[in-house]
Structures are given as structure tokens and as C-alpha cells.
Amino acid sequence: MNFKIKKLNRLAISIVSFAAMSAINYTIIHNPIVLLSCFILLIHELGHYIMAKHYKANAQFPIFIPLIIASVGITQVFDLEDQYKSNVALAGPLLASCFIICLMLFNFLYKLFSTKFLLLFLTSEILLNYIGLDGKKYRKFKQNNLSVSFS
């Protein structure tokens, strides 16, 4: 019961923050660029959440405050082995990149020119996570395999 209340509280925080931001700037809810960016950020965080749940880490329902912060509460991720930490760290950018690539293919097929450059920008923004800017990660090569670890 307590777990469901925590989930609802986190969801309520996310909804209230999105409503507050749309009240501050009315065009935020009608701007497809902002909505697409928020949706891709949500998919990014859900990638971390799903992978952490897969490895049975204590991941909590994500708090999502659009355009300011999004976080997944994972308290046991540091107890995992390096291989599993790497997978949890890479799951968010990989899932978001796959989603963006699918949107780009859809746009190129249906010739929606208005969002092509936005999707290219978002792809490059998500791919920046692989070079160590997300969560103080660094790369190291170990036995000819790339693994991402927390510093």
C-alpha cells in the first residue's frame, strides 16, 4: 500500500510540475518541439528504470519535471557488478536513440520537413551521453570491450 502511495505522489509531482510550466508559458503545451523533447527525455529515463528493474535493483518510479530535471531513483545500482552498471547507464541513451531513429525514418518516409532538423539535433544531444557527460561516467576499455563505469 505504501509503495502505491509513493508511486502516486511521484506521478502527481510530475503532473503538477508540467501544469505549472505550461501555466508559466502558454505556448509550451502547443509547441511540438517542447513536447517531443519532454517525451524523449521521459523515454530516456524509462530506459534506465527498465534496465535497473531487469537486474532487480531497487528502482523507484521516476520523477519527471519537464525541461528541468528527470530522474530515476535507483538506490541499489552501485551494488551491482560493473557489467550491470554499464548496462543500466547505457539503457537510457540507447532506448531514446532507437526511438529518435524510428521517428526520423517515419519523417523521411512521409516527408515531414518541419521536424527533421529537430530530430537530428535531439539525436546528437542523446548521443552526447556516450562520451561521458551524463552522470559523471567515464569510458574504459577492458578486455577489448567498452564498458561505462561510474566515477
Please place each PLM-identified region on the residue numbering:
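Hydrophobic transmembrane alpha-helices and their immediate loop junctions
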Residues: 1-151
